[in-house]
Amino acid sequence: EAVVPDLLDFFAATIYEQDFKHTHLGKGWTASASAKLGIPALQRMRRPAIEALKASKRFDPPMAINHVAELAKPFLSIGNQYGEGWFLAGEMAELITSGTPNIVCIQPFACLPNHVVGKGVIKELRHRYPGSNIVAIDYDPGASEVNQLNRIKLMLSTANKNLAKQNAPEQKDQAAG
């Protein structure tokens, strides 16, 4: 089943970064104020959807942006803000910790964050979360479609092998019992 991160989290990350810019990068006090007021305002706006997702049996609510930032901090500084920066690492850690270890990190147009941040933190994510299965794929005019599809198939093959390993002890217990 495909799990797609929440689009509003991208905007929340942009707002969240403003306090760091004020504290560490010399941006004016209005940047910090926009973060301190903007994040709670966005949370209030999202509250009905989050409550509905909490009540659902099939969907999970999005993680609070400050929690996503905490998940990213072992990998990158919040000061890493170009492109998606720290947020890309935080999103991948969020997916893994919430039970989605198989990730296809897709970036269009040879996007610099995927090359620098995405591919750079994938090794450390795999180290910290041993069951994770992550592949980074670029979709741009120069990319080979066959290569893209083969990388996705390889990721799915690894996911199926990992699932079989997880189910093997359960099947063994059922056969013994």
What label would you give each PLM region?
Residues E1-G177:
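An N-terminal assembly and electron-transfer interface module characteristic of large anaerobic redox
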